Amino acid sequence: MSGIVSRLSVLGKVWLGLAAGALALIVFGLAAPGSSLFFPLVSLWCNAALFALALLVLRRAGIELDLFHKAVLVGLWAAAVLYFYWTLGSRTFLYHWDYVNYILKQYHAEAAFAQNTGAGFRFLLDSITEDYTNFITLFTEFPFCLSGKTGDDYAFCQVFSVLPSLLVLLVGLTVKVGRMLRVKNRFWYFLIGFSWCATFPFVRMSAVLGQPDWFGLIFAFMLMLLTLDYRFDGIDLPRYLLIFAATAGIILTRRWYLYFVVGYCFAYVLLLVVSSVRLAKSGQQSRAVHRMVRLVVFGLCAAGAMVLLLLPMVRKILSFDYAGRYSYYNFGGITLELAAQTLRIGLLNFILIGMGLWFAAKRRLPALPCLAGTELLVSLVLFTRVQNTGSHQMLLFVPGWLLLFLVGSAALADGLKKHTAVKLCYWGFTMVFAVSVRCSPLTTVALPGFVVDHFPLKAVSEFVRLDKLTYDRTDAAQIQRVDDWIDAHCDAEK
């Protein structure tokens, strides 16, 4: 037995350890139902399994991280810990409305598992048709269980439960895109591309406000890593299973991520059709036909299995009037949404995107910009048929925008021989600007806090006042006294 284990790869040993851990959890759950340790241990196992799955996706995608990549990854994660600690500690934010939903779900999940193991898992499964599923609570319980269990604690704990897997996959995506674009200056490309994407304000916006919806980006990055350069030239069952798992994971995170899935799949199929037509014209008709046959067979099988797996959700989607339910949030349609996207992305990012489009056109590498643009357009059109986006729903567009940022980073890195100081200053200024952006419920334009507080236009002075008051409450003590009085003098049963 020891000889078999010794011959396993490191990743194989990790999966063996996870299997042993799962077995131990099953025994523990049966032996001690209702134990306060069971749910945190399940959460710890889920986080370990998710990280191992991320590493498995990297391996299947042909990505190997060297010491430089790992050092930058660890350094940026450490910087993120400091950023969250400082940001959450320098404000007084009251978690309410949408911003308290996940925290309450975490409390309810803990209470359900405190009853017994079956009640806990039943609580998780019963939410599959809801707007906010309980899927994420499996991963955020640890290390939230070790904290003071406040709203700020919940936001901070995401740095340990969500961010590691997210950053590992973002590193892999950065390397993958650089390889596809045949970047020459790989050192600067990786530094610029990875840091640019990781500091994009709308990646972390919802997390800072207590909404762990960025968890879905983990599965979005998995899907992109597994498909960006895959053309169905051969049968790859492990890859198919991973694609299916990533798609199911992103749908279970938040239902509106379905718009990204539909948009990305449409763009990917369109890209594959175009490449197959070009193959056929070059005399490789048989190869082109086999590509399309494999794609159609996989697509039909995956769609059928997904419908069966998520049948309650599918029934809810088909029978529910979402346009009527969310009409309150449909405040301008696609015209206003395009304006909102423009303001959120900002001039600095659009300059980078423009450089990337020129770079791709000059090198005759249109696939990635076209894929990202098509995905963004389809997702945008479909989503605005129901409602307009808030800051957290911006996450469903983030993968497409990040893909365009990476193409622009390739252009910036390979063009450093000219105007080096100017380009590095542009990158550095953008990083400082992005990290300084205020993450507020009222954020419309991604601007640093000191810019928002001293915005020169009098027409928006009231909006600025409300934004500052919402982000950093000065009346928290008064609200607490009112709450204490209600608790002391009012009977909840009456």
Task: Give the label of every model feature segment.
Residues 205-215:
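Short acidic/glycine- and proline-prone juxtamembrane loop motifs at membrane-interface regions
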Residues 156-184, 222:
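Transmembrane-helix motifs of polytopic, lipid-linked glycan transferases
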Residues 3, 49-59, 166-176, 269-279, ...:
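Hydrophobic, aromatic-rich transmembrane alpha-helices
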Residues 1-85, 294-298:
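Start-transfer (signal-anchor) and selected internal transmembrane alpha helices
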